[in-house]
Amino acid sequence: MRNGVTLVEDPERLDSLDQCKIILVSGSTGSGKSLLLETLEKAGEQVIHLERLAKHKGSTLGNYPGEPQPSQKMFESLLWHQIQFQLDPSQVIWVENESAKVGKVAVPNRLWKKMCQSPRIHMVVQLEDRVKFTMSDYSYFCDKENAANSAGSLEDLLGRLEKHAGKQKSKDWIQLAKEGDFEKLTKELIVGYYDLNYKKPRGDPLATYEVNCD
C-alpha cells in the first residue's frame, strides 16, 4: 500500500520495464507537458500518457468531465499491457514527470522508482502563455456562455483548496468562478496555488526549453 492506495503489481509483467529507456518531461502547471507528449506521439515517438490512462490530470481540478477514474487494478493492467505489448524497450519512451499519485490511483512502485532514476527535460513557459495553455486544457470550466453551469462543480472543487490556500483566497476564487472571469481565476490559481505547491524535480535536467504559444 502507498498513499492509501493498494497496489496490485504482477512481477512477471515487469521484466521489460527494467530495459525501458525513459525520458521525463517536467515543467510547472500550464507549461504544455501533455501537449508535448501528444505531439511526440503523433510524430511516432513512444509515450506513456499516465494522465490519459488514469483519466485524471493529476491536480485538485483534474477530474475528466463525465469520466470516472479506473480502479487501481485496471489502471495497472492498462499500464503493464502497454509496456509489455505496445512499446519497444530498446527505444526511448517519453513520460510526464507526474507525482506518485494521479488522482486516486498510484503509479506502481517499480515504474515510480524507474521514473525517479530517469533523465528529464524541463519546459519553461511565460506566465501569460501558461494561462492560455491551462484555459485550453480546462476549457470545460472556462466557458463564459455557460458560466453558471461550468462554475457549479468548479465552486465545489475550489472550496477544497481552502485548507491549502486559506479561506479568503478560496472565497475570492469561487467569486471569480461565479463571475465567469476565468482568465483572472486561472492566473491566480497558477500563482497563488500551483506554483506554491510545485515540487521541484530532483537533479538537473538534460536540457531546458523555453516554449511560447506563437
Residue ranges and their predicted role:
Residues 1, 29-31, 100-102:
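Gly/Ser/Thr-rich loops at beta-strand to alpha-helix junctions
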Residues 1-9:
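Thiolate-centered catalytic microenvironments shared by cysteine-dependent enzyme domains
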Residues 13-20:
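Phosphate-binding P-loop
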Residues 21-42:
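Glycine-rich phosphate-binding P-loop
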Residues 23-25, 46-48, 93-95, 119-123, ...:
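Hydrophobic/aromatic beta-strand patches that form the interior of the parallel beta-sheet core
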Residues 27, 97-99, 213:
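Structural motif
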Residues 42-114:
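Conserved nucleotide-sensing/catalytic segment adjacent to the nucleotide-binding pocket
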